[in-house]
Amino acid sequence: MTQGAKKAPVIWVQGEGCTGCSVSLLNAVCPR
């Protein structure tokens, strides 16, 4: 969980350009 939290910010920065990446990350962090 700790490693994922550290990698999350990097993914978020790269995901700013593509909504799909952000959505995928959200689903990975808190799937509904």
Swiss-Prot record:
The keyword Signal does not apply. It comes from the Bacteria. Its main location: periplasm. Its EC number is 1.12.99.6. It catalyses: H2 + A = AH2. GO terms for molecular function: 3 iron, 4 sulfur cluster binding; 4 iron, 4 sulfur cluster binding; hydrogenase (acceptor) activity; metal ion binding. InterPro entries: NiFe_Hase_small_N_sf (IPR037024). Belongs to the [NiFe]/[NiFeSe] hydrogenase small subunit family. This is Periplasmic [NiFeSe] hydrogenase small subunit. Binds 1 [3Fe-4S] cluster. Binds 2 [4Fe-4S] clusters. SUPFAM superfamilies: HydA/Nqo6-like (SSF56770). It comes from Desulfomicrobium norvegicum (strain DSM 1741 / NCIMB 8310) (Desulfovibrio baculatus (strain Norway 4)). It is found in: Periplasm. GO terms for cellular component: periplasmic space.
